[in-house]
Amino acid sequence: MNTVHLKLLSFTFLLVKGRARSAGPPAVARCDFRFHRTVFQFFRTMATNTNTETRQPLGLKKAKQKEPLRRVKTKENRSKRGDVHGPSTVYLQVVGAGSRDNAASLYVFSEYNRYLFNCGEGTQRLMQEHKLKAARLDNIFLTRLSWENVGGLSGMILTLKDTGVPECVLSGPPQLENYLNAIKSFSGPLEDIKLSVRPYTETYKDDTMTVYQVPIFAQLRGDSGKLFPKSGRISPSQSPASPRTDDVHINSRGDSPGERRKAARDTSLVVAFICKLHPKKGNFLVAQAKEFGLPVGTAAIGPLIAALKDGKSITYEGKEILPEQVCTPTDPGPVFIIVECPSEEFVEAVCTNQQLRRYQTGGTEDCPALVVHMTPESVLKTDQYKKWMERFPPTTEHLILNEHVCTVHNIRSHKIQAQLNTIHPEIFPELKSYKTKEPQAALHVPNVRAECLLKFQLRPVMEWQRDAIPSCNTEEFVKEASEVSNFLEEVDKCRKICSTDAAELSGQEQKYPEVVFMGTGSALPMKIRNVSGTLVNISPSQSVLLDCGEGTFGQLCRHYGDSVDDALCKISTVFISHMHADHHTGLLMLLYQRERALTTLGKAFSRIYLVAPVHIMTWLNQYHEYCEEILNHINFIPNKSLCDGAEVSKQRTKSFIQALLKKNDLEKFQTCTVRHCMNAFACSFTHQSGWKLAFSGDTMPCDAFVDIGKSATLLIHEATLEDGLEEEAVEKRHSTTSQAIDIGMRMNAEFIMLNHFSQRYAKIPLFSEDFNDRVGISFDHMRICFGDFKILPRLIPALKTLFAEDIGEMEERRERRELRHPRGSSSEVNSEQKTTRAANVSRGAKRDQEAAATHSVETKRLKTS
């Protein structure tokens, strides 16, 4: 607790104590309790609002993280023994297989340590779904500073901080220091976690292995622009120039901005990692030892085992016993290598690197068990790279991560979509996969194509393991739903009603505008709901994206499949409501992939109109200057310039606004500040044909938003929390279900779609009594048009039936909470967690525990991200 908290709480205690003493008779003191409680809550609120980066959820103590402390003690005990005894179990596991929607990332496990190699967008979501614990990570290795490798790193760091991880070290290119400084522009100070960058020249050693970092420099053609490893090209030097410095970039030094940026964001460096496990002493064979008469099971055996495992012969009762007679051989420690060769321009540098060559020509001890290639197919096809792979010993296995994979990563998302699809196939379309059209390279070495959760075990037995690879069986998912009591009956009713509605609306169907929900959850990506992103397809050729949280591009891939490039090319405008990470950290990947899509389809490059808080330019400027080019992708329009009555002084901004309206056939695009964090905005836009859409972003109920959304055809409003949690909603500056519906009624909106649900409502939110035939709830990958407004409320009975078990568990939690805190006091969070721990006898109890853990991290993220 910081100094401000202590002073305020101490003052509150003295004030309340003094009033209690002066209250006189006990009856009066009891009557005064309401005053005490009010005063205490007032000062506590002031204290928690003083520093938005360090405040904790009310009723929750800051996590002390027993697990990391236990690990520290274990390490101390190992060091006291003075025994560098390698771990018994080590394996490497694929997280992201390198597909277009899930960039290459690897998780390395030992009983002593956990490591992550690369952290693209969606990595955290996959780890959460597949139960790979981020809380145990203490080292993250990055092969290259590209958004494909670091897109999920800011979110991962925030999660590590929120879960109480004390320290995390990043290894890789030196620009990582600049990256960490850049993300602080929106994450705020990261004081609760110690972050450091290990220079790429340093060797790293811990209880599991020694990691040798191998810097590899390529000679890039032309300028050092944005590198596209998947398509094997550098963005053309004739790309439009960066926006003028007086609008979006401040150059505080006298040197040439172009030269300085080029030097600072050097893209010619990749870092390979040579990882050698520590030797592991052989195992003592008890049965054989007994045959030799050794005193197994007595105190005398300890020193004998130690000597034998150290490779020394012993003499016992006149008999010489050799180590190999009673111990398995010592494991010298296998080697694995991770190398990224992102384009053909790196092939020469990789293939001639002397540090890597040693492992092609060295002795048995240096023979790598595995080489991991994060390498596009265009590189694998080159003769030089093929020959380089063939120079490794024939016993070396090769693991390849690139777009030439056909694995499904997000199983839970596919499962729920398949089940929803049975209710309404058009509103809940089946998910798709992007498949590259590039032929697969013919390789003459033992190689395996990556799949999500594929393992290569290094110890105790060296082997491939496929038992953890998830299965995506749509038929099984649908069968599971069909076995839910009364579900099929409700689906039949729903379809009959929808058919009747469709017949009545025959000839009135209107395909556009079409709204596609890409992310409907809050705070952090989870296995079922991704974070904020809503695509509005205004016409067959133009789209607007409302918020762009981490993983939005991956969601687009899974929604559109092979047509994702067409969808990307149509996006002309992106609106960012505010600078919390769950609303904007998917922007860069979207911009880079959109440029790739335009090139692939042979279309002229065009910039996106970015309507966002002005503070986003601090982040984009720093990333552009020190990491990769990005400013040449945008025409920036500050949110405040679209507020009612705003004076726009810059002619450039005025021209951008007019171009945005013309491009999207809009009559008006308005914004207003809302009641959330600093510089949070909502928006509304009116089409030339007369329809109007209003989007709340994150906010408490807000009169200004009601004004700009008057008579909206569609209102998309956040409903983060259920009714009964109004105090928590105020604390986190969000809306409850009924509050969101009330805003729509005051707005006189034709239809209200609720959105941005707390991740505790993973599958479905709790319904309020205010639900009516003008209200619907959003799901990831849900696709609606205005003609669906009559249908959407008719889906609710089938949805309630499908998720009846989840709704029942949420209602039980609510009842327990209300029993303990009838007025919905702010300490409900802690009480709910204790309750879920106590109810540890059912399947529902386990879900409660998971919900409570998610709630804890989400609570911190909602308040500090």
What are these regions (language model features)?
Residues 137-138, 166-169, 195, 369, ...:
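Residue-level recognition of the N-termini of beta-strands and the immediately preceding loop/turn
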Residues 96, 110-112, 121, 131, ...:
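Residues that form ligand- and interface-recognition hot spots within folded domains
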Residues 117-120, 137-149, 172-173, 338-343, ...:
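Active-site neighborhood of phospho(di)ester-bond hydrolases with catalytic His/Asp-centered motifs
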Residues 49, 82-166, 176-178, 185-192, ...:
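Pre-active-site segment of Zn-dependent metallo-hydrolases
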Residues 32, 47-87, 107-109, 205-516, ...:
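Metal-dependent phosphodiesterase/nuclease catalytic metal-binding core
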